[in-house]
């Protein structure tokens, strides 16, 4: 197998520009065949696979290509249409399907697309299965093709959205409502554009919608979780109680309090961990966070007697750590929140409902709930790169890192890493003084840009 084929799967499935390698129709057909081949290899017999997508224009062709590959191998496919990624995980379990596939590039721009694969339990598939799929694609060996009378059928699940809406609402306490709450909601013109407003409205909230008119080419376009300034302004303008921003596939959430201040994944994790611990519902009194988690948040959790386990960045790594340590809550600063009591992957809508529940039960505003959390000054800069050359092979970059670490001493830290899903290098500096961390982060970002870059992303 070539080096390129081994890199087919990244940290969150396969992702790239639509109609360019690896995100081509041809590869999607082969992937469908390979998924079918792996299912037959592990358990011969009849199989069923769920297929969902977000609102990208290219989703139609990838949906058709995957279904063609799957059905050609005798697999029954259940097509859901636009639905959040956590909806695919849920429907896969609810229909007792053998696998689920989500066609999405998450927070990436519309011209990208991607493919995420879930097991029958609703978890993202393991590295072992990803490697086996890649082997089948590389060798074009998918096992025995069925006779013409045994090819699979394709069915459209017309009530998929409705089922997921009811599932999400069921994670909110029975008998309680959101009556009296005014919510500004930004769905990023993505997969949650119908589902999310329905969930909050059916629970009696007043919902003001942004990013709920997808065109196929406006997903994540200056809206959603990556651009919370939209709901920051809207919350103030509409005098709302809270703002909720989701990303393109609905598995990530950023919130805004009634004062227009951002409440990121770190703070959501803290709010929910504190609540679960008070109710003796936090497994082992521990949570899983990542290397990006703010030091001030870690100190706050420690003050509550909550152990924080640190994983690599990526919801897949967070989940793996949760399963290994039997934790039921984990999350990332970027807004991937995993509540294993409810779902098997990050779920923006369910996460929002848990925070809203805590607000109602405690009769608190969102700013009240975060008032005791003092975050350390932190700077994060994204640098677009032409290629991902190993950072430890770049002497100038390594020298800059040593200088910054020396400047920070024991009072701060620096993290430099490539994104697992985009050609981006992320610079994070944390310390005691805001002006210092901003300056040091800019220094590193400029050096990375000069060595590898295609420009700093504001």
Swiss-Prot record:
Keywords: Isomerase, Magnesium, Metal-binding, Phosphoprotein. Its cofactor is Mg(2+). Activated by phosphorylation. It catalyses: alpha-D-glucosamine 1-phosphate = D-glucosamine 6-phosphate. GO terms for cellular component: cytosol. SUPFAM superfamilies: Phosphoglucomutase, C-terminal domain (SSF55957), Phosphoglucomutase, first 3 domains (SSF53738). Binds 1 Mg(2+) ion per subunit. Belongs to the phosphohexose mutase family. Catalyzes the conversion of glucosamine-6-phosphate to glucosamine-1-phosphate. PANTHER family: PHOSPHOGLUCOMUTASE (ALPHA-D-GLUCOSE-1,6-BISPHOSPHATE-DEPENDENT), PHOSPHOHEXOSE MUTASE. This is Phosphoglucosamine mutase. It comes from Chlamydia caviae (strain ATCC VR-813 / DSM 19441 / 03DC25 / GPIC).
